A protein has these predicted regions:
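Intrinsically disordered, low-complexity regulatory regions
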Residues: 1-122
């Protein structure tokens, strides 16, 4: 359970569910659309707090913002993991290339020595 799923502002009608609606939305909507949904709710609650529910709306805005930060942090962590994987793969390829080059150099040297030995045997 993520930190933002461990509580709810303004009741517990979502927190009591096995799957919270925003988790289902995240799974179905895709990253960009879900981030937009969270961003939109931040704007909604911030815009209406003076006219409707005051502090509670500010707390809801804060809750949606915390969820948006979780989502964006997860994206950044995933991007960093991908970069690390790619860097590791590139290093491995460079290592294989270097080892292949060494093997090729060794074989060429061996072939030269063998050719000289063969000439001396004639």
């Amino acid at each position: 359970m993520t930190q933002t799923n461990s509580y709810q502002v303004g009741g517990d009608h979502y927190a009591l569910k096995t799957v919270q609606p925003w988790d289902a939305m995240e799974a179905w909507m895709g990253e960009e659309a879900f981030a937009g949904y969270l961003h939109g709710n931040c704007i909604k609650y911030l815009a209406r707090y003076m006219d409707k529910n005051g502090i509670e709306d500010l707390m809801k805005c804060q809750h949606y913002l915390a969820k948006l930060i979780e989502v964006e942090s997860k994206k950044e962590a995933m991007a960093e993991s991908i970069l690390q994987f790619q860097a590791g793969r590139e290093a491995a390829i460079c290592g294989l290339t270097r080892d292949t080059r060494r093997s090729k150099d060794w074989l060429e040297g061996y072939d030269q020595v063998k050719a000289e030995d063969d000439r001396h045997d004639d």
